[in-house]
A protein has these predicted regions:
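NTP/phosphate- and nucleic-acid-binding module
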Residues: 1-91, 99, 105-634
Length: 634
């Protein structure tokens, strides 16, 4: 018999060899029906997995991230099977689950078009109706060569995995078999509602010198109503697309002369600088000091930090005076050098140092996406150097700072604890200490979190903060990384109370993450209708006729002197046209002025939230908007 510890600490006894599915069935029929996968001792696996020793078991449904991934991964296989039925010459690349569906890269046929989606979906529904068992088995490389004969991309992956010494496994459902590690659903019948979304081109393995494949995107849900809600969200997302709104609102542009390098226009710079001013204000109050470090630094520094060995493929390099240099992809090593500029004492700690550093990372051209995925961005890094007994309090302080910032914009969020990856530096014992410190701090704050196994940075575990925007999408922005490796590599020291030299512990952390990406998220979150304090243009003055232009200009001067971002629309256009344009520009307030307003020294207010804001004296309006801006109201 074995003891299985379930969620909530309940321990149940089962015979060795019981499957995770059988355990789910013993808990309740409802859980069994909704189960997608399992997590055994922290690792996601199939429900068919046999439990042969004492373990911790969590049954994963579509409500769990890993459960959704198993669901969508199975749906990707169903799509591939349908395509295999309809287009036997198709050759399959990779087909991973994403955060809201899946894609599959397919060659061997002409690229698919939306006209073909309906037939593929119909074939998928047949496979779902057949409720085919999805079964995993382990194979040898020789068996794999036979199974995937003629499937060139699969054979390439097979040989690569075998060379790395990985255990090879396949999943079979009916007449379709795929090279895959899983996990998957137990059968195809649970995928009730499917939708193919789009097709795009993608190079095999992201290499422009390799074959161009058709990347098919799709999504699926257990219920048709859930699919309908998701498709409605996608339609809303199209309207909010930051690339579209960024152009319409004249915030930024993307040019072929700089792929992945955004150009910020005057209004976009106003927005960016407003965010930066706020960042500086809250960090000053939280006891941070701001620094700036060079963009280009010597190869020796990157070798010392570990980036040259672990991150070089993402770095831009150059040669200066016959010596290798790199444009910084991260701010951390520069922060280490700043710490070393003078001797440090325990009395100096914790030392909180912030930097709005411009970093460059080489991203594949196919991965670039507006401001969300770029090659050049401003990272709001901070590094906190501390003694071991200060770790928990400093982590708590950062969590509270992140909460303060996200709450200002109306974001809810959830937290993930990411643990040691395969490619890491440092001793296991140090990783365990660092991971436990993050866990204890977050638990003492009463915050819930999920474990994200193996997704830590190469130098330490981290807490990732995932925002939920106005239409329910999640975005990973804030990060707290606890690092005991970098201080060792850079030989950082402080003099302790005992007069001896000690090694500080360090936190890397960001709040916005990439400021450019955060702006993209804000554009979509607010659909371009920014809160007044953040809006690039807060007020537009519209004279009714030419005779009122002088009064409009006087209002513009007075509001500008009061610190309000204002413009007067003096064009020879109809008032209705000007008002409509102001609405399209999402300007918080329009002040319409004519003969009566000019005579009375008033303004007719049209607020974005309520079209008729009434008539006010200019002084009263100025006082009102100044208070709104100062309070940073949403």
């Amino acid at each position: 018999m074995i003891n299985v510890t379930l969620k909530g600490g309940v321990v149940k006894e089962f015979e060795a060899g019981v499957s995770a599915a059988d355990v789910a069935k013993s808990i309740g029929a409802g859980l069994y029906r909704s189960a997608c996968a399992a997590r055994v001792d922290g690792e996601a696996c199939d429900l068919r997995t046999a439990l042969d020793k004492d373990c911790q078991l969590e049954i994963l449904t579509f409500e769990d991230k890993d459960g959704r991934h198993a669901f969508w991964h199975t749906a990707a296989h169903i799509m591939a099977q349908a395509i295999q039925h309809l287009y036997p010459a198709a050759k399959f690349g990779i087909g991973p689950a994403l955060d809201d569906g899946w894609y599959y890269d397919i060659g061997g046929t002409a690229p698919f078009t939306p006209d073909q989606f309906e037939a593929i979906e119909a074939e998928m529904k047949k496979i779902v109706k057949a409720d085919l068992p999805v079964e995993k088995r382990f194979i040898t490389v020789e068996e794999g060569r036979e199974i995937f004969k003629g499937q060139d991309y699969k054979l390439e992956l097979l040989e690569e995995y075998a060379e790395k010494g990985w255990q090879l496994s396949v999943y079979t459902q009916g007449d379709f078999t795929d090279l895959c590690a899983g996990p998957h659903l137990m059968s195809t019948g649970a995928v009730k509602a499917v939708k193919l979304l789009s097709a795009a081109s993608a190079y095999w393995r992201g290499d422009a010198a390799r074959d161009s494949l058709c990347r098919m995107y799709g999504t699926a849900f257990p219920k048709a109503s859930e699919l309908e809600a998701h498709l409605a969200m996608l339609e809303e997302a199209k309207k909010r697309d930051h690339r579209k709104l960024g152009k319409e609102l004249e915030l930024f542009t993307l040019l072929e002369e700089g792929p992945g390098f955004p150009f910020f226009l005057p209004k976009g710079m106003t927005l960016k600088n407003t965010l930066i001013d706020y960042w500086r204000e809250v960090h000053h109050r939280a006891g941070y000091q701001e620094i700036s470090t060079p963009i280009i630094l010597s190869r020796k520094l990157w070798e010392r930090s570990g980036h040259w060995d672990h991150y070089k493929d993402n770095m831009y390099t150059t040669v200066i005076d016959e010596e290798d240099f790199a444009i910084k992809p991260m701010n951390c090593p520069g922060g280490m050098l700043v710490y070393k500029t003078k001797p440090r004492s325990y009395r100096d700690l914790p030392l909180r140092v912030g930097e709005l550093g411009l970093v460059h990372r080489h991203e594949l051209s196919g991965a670039l996406h507006g401001l969300m995925r770029v090659r050049c961005f401003t990272q709001d890094d901070a590094h906190i150097f501390m003694t071991p007994d200060q770790i928990k309090d400093e982590i708590k302080g950062v969590v509270q700072l992140i909460d303060q910032v996200y709450s200002l914009f109306g974001f809810e969020y959830h937290i993930e604890l990411s643990t040691m990856p395969e490619d890491h530096i440092g001793e296991l014992a140090d990783w365990e200490v660092a991971t436990d410190a993050l866990r204890q701090a977050i638990e003492e704050l009463g915050r819930t979190y999920e474990i994200n196994e193996g997704d830590g940075a190469f130098y330490g575990p981290k807490l990732d903060f995932h925002l939920v925007d106005a239409i329910g999408r999640t975005w990973q922005c804030g990060t707290i990384q606890l690092d005991m490796q970098m201080p060792e590599r850079f030989e950082l020291e402080y003099t302790g109370e005992d007069g001896q030299k000690h090694r500080p512990v360090m936190i890397h952390r960001v709040v916005f993450g990439s400021i450019e990406r955060f702006i993209g998220i804000l554009i979509e979150h607010f659909a371009g209708a920014f809160p007044t304090w953040l809006a690039p243009e807060q007020v537009r003055v519209i004279p009714i006729a030419e005779a009122h232009r002088g009064y409009a200009q006087e209002i513009e001067r007075q509001l500008d002197a009061a610190g309000v971002r204002v413009s007067a629309d003096l064009r020879n256009e109809k008032m209705g046209y000007k008002i409509r344009e102001g609405q399209l520009q999402r300007i918080p307030y329009m002040l319409v002025v004519g003969a009566k307003e000019m005579e009375d020294g008033t303004v007719s207010v049209r607020a974005r939230k309520e079209e008729n804001g009434g008539v006010m004296t200019l002084d009263a309006f100025t006082e009102m908007i100044q208070k709104e801006i100062a309070a940073r109201e949403r």
